[in-house]
């Protein structure tokens, strides 16, 4: 995509005494209700590609920075009572497209810049640390969905039908698959090179 429109992906456009100036877009989960975001590089194929070095940037960004625009989808919560919409009101998560229009990032907030090997490393290892809380959260969402499905089936009397029981059992299997991944990540955990 950067060949089609070089300003589409987040990249550095200039360097100043105060910091770096960035332009482009980046998705960040929870940016809509955060004070700051850990902005990471997007591109995956960094290996020795110096043409992409302007895209090899990571920093902490204030969500109210001048030139930063937030484009969010509408939330599902608040469209009705918690009793009528338990999933939407309890498990909604808003992803945000951040559009950086010449945003100044102070040097003290820059984690790395024009460092393709750091960008490759962070893209390769990031999910090692973010997957655990994600899977933990998804397990609770699965519990809520199974509960809602079972409640609905019992209220309508459909829980007596074999086909419905099979679907409920399949939901339970999916939930247990999530739990198995979480359990394995704990049981098979290894220290990272940085000691985490």
Map each language-model feature to its residues.
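Glycine-rich beta->alpha junctions and the first turn(s) of the following alpha-helix
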Residues: 81-175
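Short Gly/Thr-rich strand-loop-strand
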Residues: 11, 72-75, 82-89
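Conserved hydrophobic/aromatic beta-strand scaffold that supports enzyme active sites
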Residues: 19, 36-38, 58-60, 97-102
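Short Gly/Pro-enriched turn/cap motifs at secondary-structure boundaries
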Residues: 10-11, 28, 49-50, 87-91
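A short core secondary-structure module
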Residues: 25, 29-80
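A generic structural signal for well-ordered coil/turn residues at beta-strand boundaries
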Residues: 16, 33, 55, 92-99
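C-terminal helix-coil-helix/basic helical segment that borders enzyme active sites and/or dimer interfaces
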Residues: 179-196
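Gly/Pro-rich turn-and-neighbor structural signature
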Residues: 1-23
């Amino acid at each position: 995509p950067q060949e089609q429109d070089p300003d589409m992906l987040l990249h550095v456009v200039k360097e100043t005494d105060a910091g770096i100036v960035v332009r482009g877009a980046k998705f960040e989960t929870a940016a809509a209700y955060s004070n700051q975001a850990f902005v990471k590089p997007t591109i995956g194929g960094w290996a020795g590609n110096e043409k992409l070095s302007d895209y090899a940037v990571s920093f902490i960004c204030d969500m109210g920075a001048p030139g930063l625009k937030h484009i969010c989808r509408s939330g599902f919560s608040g469209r009705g009572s918690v009793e009528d919409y338990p999933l939407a009101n309890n498990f909604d998560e808003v992803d945000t497209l951040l559009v950086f229009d010449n945003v100044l990032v102070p040097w003290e907030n820059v984690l790395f810049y024009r460092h393709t090997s750091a960008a490759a490393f962070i893209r390769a290892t990031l999910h090692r640390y973010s997957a655990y809380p994600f899977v933990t959260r998804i397990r609770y969402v699965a519990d809520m969905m199974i509960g809602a499905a079972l409640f609905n089936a019992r209220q309508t009397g459909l829980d007596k039908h074999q086909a419905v029981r099979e679907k409920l059992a399949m939901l339970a299997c999916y939930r247990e698959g999530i739990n198995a991944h979480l359990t394995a990540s704990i049981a098979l955990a290894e220290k990272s090179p940085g000691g985490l």
